């Protein structure tokens, strides 16, 4: 693959420039074609298996077996086929819990029930785990020998909210004992423990979890072979759909030809699509994925313009032009910014045309407002850089909540969804609801932690790390630890917002939840969007390139 300097024209002398690596994938997804004939041959088999799985909800009566069935269905990525059945089963399970029918459950069963119910929005008390403590108020040492129970409690504990102190204790207790027992357990339990200790299930991107779990479940002697076969066929079917979407988005990006005109920006459109699959991978969210992917591409161009290439004077002009949103009012912009503005307007106009036929053109107003807010936040940071100002943590977060891009991307995804998104939902979304605010804080902090040292090697807006260090007089490592604690606290806030009753439909709430899950993957080891050459490359290959053997 050519280097960036041979692929792109020389930059204007005196301009800032970051040598981002070129696209990992190039035109791979334009040239690749899904094996449609193979998929068609299995279509009938998939429908047959789906109905067999559906019947299991009425034939499986044992509480633990039904919990294991629901857990496996969710982990294997096929739960969207059985939403009504799962909702009914968990509703009955909650009623049984209220009536004390779970008093005799062991640790593994009770923790699994707690996790499934909290995931469904039921506010089950964490006090149910008190019976596993000894007379001194600590978790009983006998539990250390129950690896399945420890893992079940560990996974459940990450659905805690503020005040669930016993779940904080459970995380500490189970982490210590799972690490110590890991060398002594065998597959597939070993792999489940390793994955959990890396990123707990509740915080893991669902589609990647499915890819991992299919391989793990295949090794489970107690697996349900019908469910396993169905999940494999479904994975391949959706992989084919995602490949077609990647082809369409790659062709769109190629036709835009922005890299030739704006060589300073990152080429990460496929990584942006990966992000959207982490939000919702199901077929009926296809349009939302496409809209959000395009808006990620535009946001990346804007970010690199404000952060790296543009002068402050130019950025002031661009921001004012975006605020006016008038195609005939851009003469004052330098040529390269005209390219940006026209591309942005063309993209939003195309989305509006698509929505107009369904009577949903009113949604575009909210997207435009979100883009304007993003531009203003980027400009505020550019002004800080220009003046050398280090803001307070409060000043920084007020702007960074918007520049983290999530408020705009949230709206972008919503406008592509079905009738569950109403004008009232969009009004709620545009006014920074608590859950979105928390997600944006977590996003900014998780971005700043791995990106900090790299970005500070050049002139860049002070990150939350620098702001915290200056304001509190702490060391770098102390500040990083504090930010990690803030991320953990943010997750508790998010968990609380997911409990019933929610202010908007669960499908909308889950967009924010899944956004936050993607962050755990993208920023686990580095800024995996900017440097997409390692883990992100592997993740994309596992979801969209490598097939699962039947």
From Swiss-Prot:
What InterPro entries would the database entry show?
Isoprenoid_synthase_dom_sf, Terpene_cyclase-like_1_C, Terpene_cyclase_plant_C1, Terpene_synth_N, Terpene_synth_N_sf, Terpene_synthase-like, Terpene_synthase_metal-bd, Terpenoid_cyclase/PrenylTrfase
Activity versus pH, per record: Optimum pH is 7.5.
Q: Where does Mg(2+) 1 bind?
A: 303, 307
Short sequence motif named DDXXD motif, residue ranges: 303-307
Q: In which pathway does it act?
A: Secondary metabolite biosynthesis; terpenoid biosynthesis
Residues involved in Mg(2+) 3 binding: 447, 455
Tell me the keywords, alphabetical order.
Answer: Lyase, Magnesium, Metal-binding
Task: Give the record's GO biological process terms.
Answer: diterpenoid biosynthetic process; farnesyl diphosphate metabolic process; sesquiterpene biosynthetic process
Which residues take part in binding Mg(2+) 2? 303, 307
Q: What is its EC number?
A: 4.2.3.128
Please describe how the activity of this protein depends on temperature. Answer: Optimum temperature is 24-26 degrees Celsius.
Q: What class of enzyme is it?
A: lyase
Q: How does the cofactor attach, per the note?
A: Binds 3 Mg(2+) ions per subunit.
Q: Listed GO molecular functions?
A: magnesium ion binding; sesquiterpene synthase activity
Family, per entry: Belongs to the terpene synthase family. Tpsa subfamily.
Question: Function of this protein?
Answer: Sesquiterpene synthase converting farnesyl diphosphate into beta-cubebene (24.5%), alpha-muurolene (19.3%), delta-cadinol (18.6%), delta-elemene (16.0%), tau-muurolene (10.8%), and beta-elemene (10.8%). No activity with geranyl diphosphate or geranylgeranyl diphosphate.
Please provide the record's free-text comment about the domains of this protein: The Asp-Asp-Xaa-Xaa-Asp/Glu (DDXXD/E) motif is important for the catalytic activity, presumably through binding to Mg(2+).
What protein am I looking at? Beta-cubebene synthase
Query: Which organism encodes this protein?
Result: Magnolia grandiflora (Southern magnolia)
């Amino acid at each position: 693959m050519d280097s960036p300097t041979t692929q792109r024209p020389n930059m204007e002398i005196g301009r800032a420039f970051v040598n981002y690596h070129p696209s990992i994938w190039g035109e791979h997804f334009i040239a690749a074609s899904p094996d449609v004939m193979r998929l068609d041959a299995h279509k009938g088999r998939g429908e047959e298996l789906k109905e067999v799985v559906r019947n299991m909800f009425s034939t499986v009566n044992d509480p633990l077996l039904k919990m294991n069935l629901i857990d496996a269905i969710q982990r294997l990525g096929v739960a969207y086929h059985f939403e009504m059945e799962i909702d009914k089963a968990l509703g009955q399970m909650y009623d049984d819990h209220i009536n004390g029918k779970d008093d005799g459950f062991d640790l593994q069963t009770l923790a699994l029930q707690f996790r499934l119910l909290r995931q469904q929005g039921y506010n089950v008390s964490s006090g149910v785990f008190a019976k596993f403590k000894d007379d001194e108020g600590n978790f009983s040492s006998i539990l250390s020998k129950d690896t399945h129970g420890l893992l079940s409690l560990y996974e459940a504990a990450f659905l805690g909210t503020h005040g669930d102190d016993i779940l904080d204790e459970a995380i500490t207790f189970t982490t210590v004992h799972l690490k110590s027992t890991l060398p002594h357990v065998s597959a597939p339990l070993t792999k489940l423990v390793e994955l959990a200790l890396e990123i707990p299930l509740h915080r893991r991107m669902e589609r990647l979890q499915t890819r991992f779990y299919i391989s793990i479940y295949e090794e489970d002697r107690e697996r349900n072979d019908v469910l396993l076969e169905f999940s494999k066929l479904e994975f391949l079917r959706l992989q084919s759909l995602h490949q077609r979407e990647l082809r369409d988005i790659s062709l769109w990006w190629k036709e835009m030809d922005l890299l030739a005109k704006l060589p300073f920006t990152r080429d990460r459109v496929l990584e942006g699509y990966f992000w959207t699959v982490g939000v919702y991978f199901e077929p009926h969210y296809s349009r939302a994925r496409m809209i959000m992917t395009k808006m990620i591409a535009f946001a990346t161009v804007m970010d690199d313009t404000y952060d790296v290439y543009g002068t402050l004077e130019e950025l002031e002009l661009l921001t004012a032009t975006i605020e006016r949103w008038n195609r005939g009012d851009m003469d004052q912009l330098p040529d390269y910014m005209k390219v940006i503005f026209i591309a942005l307007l063309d993209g939003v106009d195309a989305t509006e045309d698509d929505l107009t036929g369904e009577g949903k053109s009113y949604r575009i107003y909210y997207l435009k407002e979100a883009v304007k807010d993003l531009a203003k936040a980027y400009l505020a940071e550019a002004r800080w850089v220009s003046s050398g100002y280090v803001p307070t943590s409060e000043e920084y977060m007020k702007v960074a909540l918007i520049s983290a891009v999530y408020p705009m991307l949230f709206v972008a995804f919503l406008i592509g969804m079905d009738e569950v998104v109403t004008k009232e939902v969009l009004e709620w979304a545009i006014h920074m609801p608590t859950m979105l605010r928390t997600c944006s804080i977590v996003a900014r902090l998780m971005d700043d932690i791995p990106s900090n040292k790299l970005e500070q090697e050049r002139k860049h807006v002070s990150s939350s790390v620098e702001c915290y260090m200056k304001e509190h007089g702490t060391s770098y490592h102390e500040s990083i630890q504090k930010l990690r604690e803030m991320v953990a606290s943010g997750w508790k806030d998010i968990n609380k917002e997911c409990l019933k009753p929610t202010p908007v439909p669960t499908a909308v709430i889950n967009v924010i939840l899944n956004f936050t899950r993607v962050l755990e993957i993208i920023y686990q080891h580095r800024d995996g969007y900017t440097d997409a050459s390692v883990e992100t490359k592997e993740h994309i290959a596992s979801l969209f390139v490598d097939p699962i053997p039947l």
